[in-house]
Amino acid sequence: MKKGFTLIEMLVVIGIIAVLMGTGAGAYSGIVKAAEKKRCQELVADTATALTALYQKNGAWPKALRRGNATDVELDKDAALPLAKAGYMSLSMNDGKLSGYDRFGIVSPWGAAHIKKRGAAASLSDKIGSRSLQDHILHCALDLDGDGIIEGALVGGESVDIRATAAVWCCGKDGVIERYSTGLKKDDAYSWSYGQTQGVK
């Protein structure tokens, strides 16, 4: 009676291990993507909550947030500053300006990771994949007339009415803010639910 494995038996075992590793790698990739999307979702929800609290406290929107008709405002260093000053978001400040990792405003988790990696050398024109750091700044729309409805929020160029005081959205890892109707199925994150856009009059 022989002891040990034959070459065929070893190849079968190696093949089984390879299949299991391939399956595990695919599952791991899905878990990582879901975790990234969840972090982004939490960021937009927290930012919308902070904006709503700021409005409720002051009874009006700060001038830095009332750009144009406030249907697509970048939460850049100027627009994010009122949130930092009011203490609603823990953003780094120095001499009344955003500083450190927060010096560009509120950015996606991928933008934040890039800024931390590059440190002081980071700039808005830096590439993250095929897009720039500028593309990773969060966007918001505001209810300017106080009726609880944001009329005509421009989400990826698509006009959307939303039942909310403040709505915040963010691109996915690709740096592209999709049209709202297609972004729901992709990697973009929104502070509101689909139901908040239905039957708005």
Give the location of each predicted region.
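Short, glycine/small-hydrophobic-rich surface segments
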Residues: L51-W110, L124
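Extracellular/surface-associated beta-sandwich interaction domains
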Residues: L20, G30-T49, Y55-W61, L65
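Extended low-polarity, hydrophobic cluster-rich segments
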Residues: C40, A84-G87, T165-A166
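Glycine-rich, aromatic-lined ligand/substrate-binding cores of catalytic
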Residues: S108, A112-A113, G119, S132
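Short, surface-exposed interaction loops/tails
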Residues: K37-K38, A45, T49-T52, S125-K201
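N-terminal single-pass transmembrane signal-anchor helix
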Residues: M1-I31, E36
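Short, ordered coil/turn segments that flank beta-strands lining enzyme active or ligand-binding pockets
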Residues: K2, K57, P109, L144-G146, ...
